[in-house]
């Protein structure tokens, strides 16, 4: 992970696939949310997802996925991250935009 950028990779199993043997949509969204969160928090602050818009272009039966998140805009409280997910042949499978809300510094512990 570097400033304003994060990469999440996953090797797929039968648990990540649908009945047709292709990747389950929830797997794509989970990876995308992790990549968006990683890119957002690369500035040392903690973020939560408040919204996303996601598009599925094609599916795959390959065994490895790479999600890449890049910050497009960062303000005091909001961070907008674009995410793309590709397979190991670098074919674009899906992507989206995530809006993240800053909830504080990474090292803080919530008070009761």
Describe each model-derived feature in a short phrase:
Residues 17, 21-22, 33, 65, ...:
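Short glycine- and Lys/Arg-enriched binding-loop motifs that mark or flank ligand-binding interfaces
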Residues 60-62, 66-68, 72-112:
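HotDog/MaoC-like acyl-thioester-processing domains
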Residues 37-66, 71:
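Hydrophobic beta-strand-centered segment that forms part of the acyl-chain substrate-binding groove
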Residues 20-41, 49:
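Compact, glycine-rich, soluble single-domain proteins
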Residues 1-21:
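Catalytic strand-loop segment that frames the active site of acyl-thioester-processing enzymes
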């Amino acid at each position: 992970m570097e400033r304003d950028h994060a990469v999440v990779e996953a090797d797929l199993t039968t648990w990540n696939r649908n009945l047709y043997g292709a990747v389950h949509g929830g797997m794509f969204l989970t990876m995308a949310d992790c990549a968006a969160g990683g890119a957002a928090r690369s500035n040392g602050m903690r973020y939560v997802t408040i919204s996303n818009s996601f598009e599925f272009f094609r599916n795959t039966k390959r065994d490895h996925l790479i999600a890449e998140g890049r910050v497009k805009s960062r303000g005091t409280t909001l961070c907008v991250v674009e995410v793309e997910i590709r397979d190991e042949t670098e074919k674009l499978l899906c992507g989206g935009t995530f809006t993240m809300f800053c909830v504080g510094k990474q090292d803080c512990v919530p008070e009761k």
